[in-house]
From Swiss-Prot:
ATP binds at residues 108-114. HAMAP family: MurC (MF_00046). This is UDP-N-acetylmuramate--L-alanine ligase. It is found in: Cytoplasm. It is an enzyme of class 6 (ligase). Keywords: ATP-binding, Cell cycle, Cell division, Cell shape, Cell wall biogenesis/degradation, Cytoplasm, Ligase, Nucleotide-binding, Peptidoglycan synthesis. GO terms for cellular component: cytoplasm. It holds the Pfam family Mur_ligase_C. One of its GO terms (molecular function) is UDP-N-acetylmuramate-L-alanine ligase activity. Its main location: cytoplasm. One of its GO terms (biological process) is cell division. Pathway: Cell wall biogenesis; peptidoglycan biosynthesis. Its EC number is 6.3.2.8.
Length: 435
């Protein structure tokens, strides 16, 4: 048994990694800011201690895991170096852990978390599988053969991984504080592809992924006729989405998923192709796909009187469009209201017009103040800059969420990667107080 201390244990990758090590009978604790994050719920359930930052948290018998958001001059990291402790960056430790399993890395500019969650759900129902999902969920399963994990492209961290398989969902320009442009992102994915050991499952409808060269078999999935795994006859029903799958030109089977939207079908195709490559029984894969309840903060639904409230992590224009599409396919002619909080000034500045176009797909738009990050607390753009590009858009301030009551029988999409949940909770409290 080892003793681990996580610096930044509430991170979306750090929290599940801590859970995995805890499940493997290690002693695990960590430190972070006091502000509540959804990622700490699972830590609390497992009794993993969360401490305020303090150099005194570091002791001589620990292995230290350093979160990506924390620099080498953080007081706890400085103390760990003084004591001569072994210190791993998050991505370094994850890369070493994955080497002990048949590993599947899920990467892409969008859809990583949902696809990782879906693959983990399917595989763990068929054979022992450990997993790390970027919604704060992780589990280390005894006697696991497989390890399914989310692999982020930011700062090329995924180059620390050498997985057996990789699912690549798409390539898009994001993280403009690091990548110089789309070509830089494509280059990063190309580097990653060269490190995969057995096979790559990639979305063939993404023209950027079609450029990828690999030293292993490359299987494509999508809607286009050129794909190896292809979805046809896609139908939205009251209980989800059904579609036929063809493997090249041969009928493979009819599948049903609880989710809606083209992105949900693509995620399922990626999982179907991966499981076929690993020779997992098709009928069991079908059964598991039908019982997937989603991951945290990805179209997470609740009801409030006659309204549907959706909590979603969408923070890029393409993700916003996918969320609006899913709402329309599931709820038909009901009004779709977008409540959006931009995440980082750099991202908003880089994609200002694209955000405006995506948000305009909703019937009504409310904009919340920009959420900075640990790396960026201020910038040269304002929320009013975005408002001016969307006809009829409103600014939503804290304390003013009661205005959302005006949208009877609507679907309210609370979208963002910051603390948009606080706006939703405030609105829920306003309505409950009036009941």
């Amino acid at each position: 048994m080892n003793r681990y201390h996580f610096v930044g244990i509430k991170g979306t990758g750090m929290s599940p990694l801590a859970q995995i090590l805890f499940d493997m009978n290690n002693e695990v604790r960590g430190s972070d800011v006091e502000k509540a994050f959804f990622t700490e719920e699972a830590l609390n359930r497992k009794g993993i201690e969360i401490l305020p930052f303090d150099p005194e948290n570091i002791s001589e018998d620990q292995i230290v895991v350093q979160g990506n958001a924390f620099s080498d001059d953080h007081p706890e990291i400085v103390r760990a170096r003084e004591l001569g402790l072994t210190i791993y960056k998050y991505y370094e430790f994850l890369g070493e852990l994955a080497n002990h399993y048949t590993s599947v890395a899920i990467t892409g500019s969008h859809g990583k978390t949902s696809t990782t969650g879906l693959l983990a759900h399917v595989m763990r129902g068929i054979e022992p599988t450990s997993f790390l999902i970027g919604d704060g969920t992780g589990e280390g399963v005894a006697d696991s053969k497989n390890f399914v994990f989310e692999a982020c492209e930011y700062k090329r961290h995924f180059l620390y991984y050498r997985p057996d398989y990789a699912i690549m969902t798409n390539i898009d320009f994001d993280h403009s504080d690091y990548f110089s442009g789309l070509d830089d992102v494509i280059d990063a994915f190309q580097e990653m592809a060269k490190q995969v050991k057995k096979g790559i499952i990639a979305c063939g409808d993404d023209e950027n992924l079609q450029q990828i060269q690999a030293n292993v078999p490359l299987v494509y999935y999508g809607f286009g006729a050129h794909n190896d795994f292809r979805a046809e006859q896609v139908t939205s029903t009251e209980n989800g989405t059904t579609f036929d799958v063809f493997l090249r030109d041969d009928f493979y089977g009819t599948f049903r998923i609880p989710g809606y939207g083209d992105h949900s079908v693509l995620n399922a195709l990626a999982v179907i192709a991966t499981c076929d490559y690993e020779n997992l029984p098709k009928e069991l894969v079908k059964e598991r796909l039908e019982t997937f309840n989603g991951v945290k903060r990805r179209f997470s639904e609740s009801t409030l009187n006659d309204q549907v409230l959706v909590d979603d992590y969408a923070h890029h224009p393409r993700e916003i469009s996918a969320t609006v599409e899913a709402a329309r396919k599931k709820y038909g002619n009901r009004e779709v209201v977008a409540i959006f909080q931009p995440h980082t000034y750099t991202r908003l500045k880089s994609f200002m017009d694209d955000f405006a176009t995506a948000l305009a797909e909703a019937d009504t738009v409310y904009l919340c103040d920009i959420f900075g990050s640990a790396r960026e607390q201020e910038g040269t753009v304002t929320i009013e800059d975005l408002q001016s590009r969307i006809e009829g858009a409103h600014i939503l301030k804290r304390g003013g969420t009661g205005v959302l009551r005006n949208h009877a029988d609507a679907v309210l999409l609370f979208m963002g990667a910051g603390d948009i949940q606080t706006y939703q909770r405030e609105y829920e409290e306003v309505v409950k107080l009036e009941a």
